[in-house]
Amino acid sequence: MKTSRLPIAIQQAVMRRLREKLAQANLKLGRNYPEPKLSYTQRGTSAGTAWLESYEIRLNPVLLLENSEAFIEEVVPHELAHLLVWKHFGRVAPHGKEWKWMMESVLGVPARRTHQFELQSVRRNTFPYSCKCQEHQLTVRRHNRVVRGEAVYRCVHCGEQLVAK
């Protein structure tokens, strides 16, 4: 994977969004939750992750650089919501009703579980598989699970088992 140096302007925009949404949440919840640690160490196809125990948000620098505006608007509040839900409710379903409420009612952001960013630049080796209706690209991890007989994957559209090409 290529590594990227993030321009300071993008890092500042991320911090502005994080602080803005945290202040909004603290005001609406009547709390004073601290600012989480922020790092740009997320890799692979995940845009970001929230680490509850260390109260940290890890963002993918490549996807951030390639999709700055949408990333800052969507991913930063998404991960912050996970931390706020954990602080406010304790351990609950990652994208459950509490998270959805936090996103929509408290942070004022549409509650989307996944991003729609182009992943070609962050995708490592993939392996072609097919079904009746289309070709699929499986990650190295999923491909190895198939090879070892540990997993079977099916198409979400036609339901047929995926077969290596």
From Swiss-Prot:
Pfam families: SprT-like (PF10263), Zn_ribbon_SprT (PF17283). Residues 20-163 form the SprT-like domain. GO terms for biological process: response to stress. Coiled coil: none annotated. SMART domains: SprT. The active site is at E79. Zn(2+) binds at H78, H82. Binds 1 zinc ion. GO terms for cellular component: cytoplasm. GO terms for molecular function: zinc ion binding. Keywords: Cytoplasm, Metal-binding, Zinc. InterPro entries: SprT-like_domain, SprT_Zn_ribbon, Uncharacterised_SprT. The keyword Ligase does not apply. It is found in: Cytoplasm. PANTHER family: PROTEIN SPRT. Belongs to the SprT family. This is Protein SprT. The gene is sprT.
